[in-house]
Amino acid sequence: MKMAIIARTRYYEINNNLKKEMFLKNYYIECLTKLGVLLIPILSENNMEQIVDYCDALLITGGPNNIYPDYYGEQPDPNIEYKIDEFPLVKKAVTLFSKVKKPILGICAGIQELNVIFGGTLYQNIPNHYLTQKTSTNTMHTVRIEKKSFLHKVYQSDSINVNSYHHQAIKDLAPNFSVSAISSDGYIEGIEKGNIIGVQWHPEIMKDLNFFKKFINEYMK
């Protein structure tokens, strides 16, 4: 099984000069390689059609960059940093994979990008949704799982405890998507439309192999 994975971009400093680098967090690599998945990084918009042809699914990883509000018709909050625009790369990947009906999984920033790509909007800043420590056992709040959703198949439960590492969230849901999870304070934390799935938390940090295994079995086989 082959899964394309969005590599993220960040700045780093060398000799007082800012440089860009692309990276993948090891959490994703550890979880998915254990399940026999070959990960193919998407590093640019060039030759993306070949990656789509070769791969069985797309994973949109979490990342450090906020989505420019222009993409969902709002003015930027002056208190929020908008440094690197990754949206065109992600949008092209989502457009190409969805066009050929291959499954897509969006995590954290990935769920937000999916929502905006398909016509939704975001809250630019929300309080109390960011844990300071990243461990497999750290959770922050409960989410309610909607019955008959993919997530309910995964967890066989009406609620679960999840971690939280975000300060933006879905506001207006994209047309034709359904909500699959809602946080205890009322924010959308899971969405789905057919074989397009998004979650706001980080199952890879929680080492939730069952989540990824269910996605693979449900949509990639």
PLM region spans:
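Active-site loop->helix "elbow" adjoining a glycine-rich segment at hydrolase catalytic centers
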Residues: 109-111, 118
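N-terminal beta1-alpha1 cap of cysteine-dependent amidohydrolase-like domains
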Residues: 1-105, 117, 127-155, 171-177, ...
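Active-site glycine-centered loops adjacent to acidic/histidine catalytic or metal-binding residues
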Residues: 108, 166, 202
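Post-Walker A helix-loop "phosphate-sensing" segment adjacent to the P-loop in P-loop NTPases
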Residues: 119-123
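Short, surface-exposed beta-strand/loop micro-motifs that present aromatic residues
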Residues: 187-193
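Beta-strand-turn-beta hairpins that frame and shape the catalytic cleft
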Residues: 176, 193-196
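Short catalytic/ligand-gating loop segments at beta-alpha or beta-beta junctions
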Residues: 159-167, 191
